[in-house]
Regions:
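Short, well-ordered beta-strand elements within core beta-sheets of diverse protein domains
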Residues: 229-235
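C-terminus-biased signal that marks the final domain/tail of proteins
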Residues: 2-143, 235-276, 282-416
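Internal mixed beta-strand/loop scaffold within catalytic domains of large alpha/beta enzymes
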Residues: 115-228, 370, 382-384, 391-392
Length: 416
């Protein structure tokens, strides 16, 4: 399926971004299929230079922030090999294939999939404490602002889900859009850092998964990495099974999960190792950021909780205000522009809803909106911006969500 002529065209993974205007850049696209090992090898071969660029960046970032060598980081990541193998052996096989295809070590790929867990691991904080025994200052949670809009919040009657994915600018050129064909499981479309097996996206069953880091350190019992949990959620064929994964799985770190389905339903779960909180939309609109909105977990409240990303307190209401205009939309084209405009808000710049690098910080600590995504769960179209949405048009991906298992007659809307 070719991209619409009015949209940015996709480029193969591993290609250099276009020179000149950065707004003309498109995200690389990768499609994989076959057995888990075959899928992994296809993926690794396609993103080989991007994966090695990501490894180089995180080696520098961990070295600068914690004084750790990459060997120590992978040694920490090895803690997750056994639990992931027990929970999802097919994903370990996929990671093994990625490593083979990219010419990397399995623990390198595992570290990329557990980078958040390494950062927020309680024992990691202890081994990186200074000589006085003080742990390092907790890093801000992975920044994102997610939304779901349907029913009275959507003037054209479509079901929308998406987010601004804010993370370190140094990995911007390692982000790819991946389509995973894995029957009988649903086909997935996700935005990921090269080598990751899961992050955020949507599937052919009409389920969208958007996520936000929440921060806070809990106990040091081993839980599953977010990439594995999120991939498992998107592997489900209905909303109840997707929720079941989140409620029955103990993740290692806290993360917010916003689930939206094509039937016109959404629920938000603030998942933590200590328990979950949940929220429902108000009049069809739900927005979540990087602070606890359903309730602060008791262990964090007892310790005097303060949001690790104070700008989230601004981003959430600004997104709500901007997306309120969607209820008056008369058609999908207008809706998409209203959403892009809402997600381009700059109040509090540079740490705004549309995030830009802060020139006051060292380059390795620069944050930016890596991708602004929009899934139309009514039509199955998936749109993204390759960077900040304020100065870019949506890139129309060359796939439809409903070209896969569970995407047949029960899907709402029509396929383009």
């Amino acid at each position: 399926m070719a991209p619409l002529p009015t949209e940015s065209a996709p480029v193969p993974a591993g290609s250099a971004p276009p020179s000149g205007n950065p707004a003309a850049r498109s995200l690389p696209v990768v499609e994989i299929s076959g057995t888990p090992l075959e899928r992994g090898r296809q993926y690794g071969e396609a993103v080989r230079p991007l994966l090695h660029a990501s490894l180089a960046y995180y080696e520098e970032a961990f070295g600068r922030s914690a004084g750790l060598t990459w060997e120590k980081v992978t040694a920490r990541a090895a803690r997750w090999l056994a639990p992931v193998t027990a929970y999802a052996p097919h994903l370990v096989e996929e990671m093994r294939g990625i490593a083979d295809g990219a010419g990397a070590d399995l623990l390198d790929v595992l570290a990329l999939n557990a980078r958040g867990e390494v950062i927020y691991d309680k024992s990691f904080a202890e081994i990186t404490a200074d000589r006085a025994g003080r742990p390092p200052e907790e890093e801000p949670a992975e920044g994102c602002t997610s939304f779901a809009a349907y029913g009275p919040a959507s003037g054209d009657g479509h079901v929308y889900a998406g987010q601004n994915w804010d993370w370190r600018a140094g990995v911007a050129d390692t982000v790819v859009m991946i389509r995973i064909v894995q029957p009988p499981r649903p086909t997935l479309i996700m935005q990921v850092e090269a080598g990751q097996v899961g992050r955020q996206g949507a599937n052919s069953a009409g389920i969208a998964f958007n996520a936000n880091g929440l921060g806070g350190r809990f106990d040091d019992r081993i839980g599953l990495p977010q990439t594995v949990v999120r991939r498992t959620v998107l592997d489900q064929g209905n909303i109840a099974d997707a929720l079941d994964v989140l409620c029955r799985t103990r993740a290692h770190i806290a993360s917010n999960a916003l689930l939206t389905c094509r039937e016109g339903f959404a629920i938000d779960l603030e998942t933590t190792p200590a328990g979950h909180g949940w929220m429902y939309p108000t009049d069809g609109l739900l927005v979540h950021g990087n602070h606890y909105q359903a309730g602060v977990p008791a262990p964090l409240a007892a310790a005097g909780y303060r949001p690790m990303s104070p700008d989230s307190l601004v981003r959430v209401p600004r997104a709500e205000q901007g997306l309120a205009a969607l209820r008056h939309s008369t058609g999908p084209a207008e809706s998409r522009e209203l959403i892009r405009r809402a997600m381009s808000d700059h109040l509090g710049h540079p740490e705004s809803l549309c995030t830009h690098p802060d020139p006051r910080r060292p380059a390795v600590e620069h944050w930016t909106t890596l991708v602004s995504s929009l899934a139309d769960l009514t039509t199955g179209e998936y749109l993204v911006t390759a960077g900040t949405p304020c100065d870019r048009a949506y890139q129309h991906l060359p796939w439809n969500l409903y070209d896969g298992p569970h995407g047949g007659p029960e899907a709402t809307g029509t396929h383009p």
